[in-house]
């Protein structure tokens, strides 16, 4: 009787441990970075002056739940690309960056449970920033880790 109970327990454990839940659907959809319904900023080829602020405005959406976003500004003095730019812009001559090349990189949270979020930030360009070509990069991640990237070429005068 003990052996039968032990054998039944092992079989039951094996059935539970090996069962799969095919009803679970993994979220593989990337979040969306859009200007739909808002006036987005910045856009490709936009020009800013040193000492001014960039008024960042974009809408993010996701099929399940947004997570967070990151904004990065880095120099494009070497004319590299990110493959997400909407249009090509007139570039200055290639050059080496100096210590005054502007660099910005900051993470921002999105309220829990959000499927849509209108993001806005004011980013001050230092008066001492090196003029030239820059990339403004937006990264949005949803709660399951899917990420969308959008990079725009901007110029600082």
Could you describe each region identified by the protein language model?
Residues 2-3, 9-39:
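Bacterial Sec-dependent N-terminal signal peptides
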Residues 27-157:
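First exposed extracellular module after export/assembly in secreted or surface-exposed proteins
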């Amino acid at each position: 009787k003990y052996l039968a109970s032990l054998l039944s327990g092992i079989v039951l454990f094996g059935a539970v441990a090996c069962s799969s839940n095919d009803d679970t659907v993994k979220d593989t959809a990337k979040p969306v970075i859009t200007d739909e319904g808002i006036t987005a900023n910045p856009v490709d080829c936009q020009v800013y002056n040193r000492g001014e602020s960039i008024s960042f405005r974009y809408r993010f959406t996701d099929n399940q739940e947004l997570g967070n976003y990151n904004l990065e500004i880095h120099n494009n003095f070497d004319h590299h690309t990110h493959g997400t730019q909407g249009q090509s812009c007139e570039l200055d001559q290639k050059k080496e960056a100096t210590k005054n090349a502007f660099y910005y990189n900051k993470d921002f949270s999105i309220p829990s449970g959000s499927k849509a979020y209108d993001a806005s930030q004011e980013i001050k360009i230092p008066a001492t920033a090196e003029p030239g070509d820059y990339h403004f990069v937006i990264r949005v991640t949803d709660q399951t880790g899917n990420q969308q990237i959008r990079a725009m070429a901007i110029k600082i005068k």
